[in-house]
Amino acid sequence: MKPPLGEANLRDLALHYAARFATTGARLEAYLVRKIRERGLAQDDDGRTIDPDIRALVARLVELSYVDDDAYARSRARDLGARGYGARRVEETLRHAGVAEPLRQAHAPGEAASRQAAALMARKRRLGPYGVSGLGKGDPLAIRKAREKAVAAMLRAGHQYEHARYILAAQRPEDVEQWVGEAFEDSGDEEGIKDQW
């Protein structure tokens, strides 16, 4: 069994965790609380249990830029978008990580980035015009079930219903690419530089 934690041990654990993982202040605080629960707290020379200030320790690491919620949110949002996840999924992931509301809003994708992520997911999962030709042809029930399943998959991934509906109704991949391109043009960013994850 590992010994109880003193203030130096907590500081070392916090530094090790921040060095090893991209994290938020809230996650680091939860990690330290969990470690205290697992191992307990050490006693001082008088036999009293120490009372560490975890919030102050986390605040100090934030002050030293070892923990940066903004950088975490930016990186995580970009990563999820590049994997084809939608805005709702990104927001939920950041909220779960303890990122504050203003930062979540600041890193929410724009319309063009949302469309781009939806198109990427459809391409990866072979949905809509990216799917296998002839699947369910002639059987309206099979077509309807496949469409409902595809819509559900896109909604679970955090995409807007309108985006899922448009992509699944598209006849050709070029139609989807044009739709994504129009959103980038409307944002004044034809190359997709500003409105990215």
Residues of each region from the PLM?
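An alpha-helical, amphipathic repeat domain used for nucleic-acid recognition
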Residues: 1-197
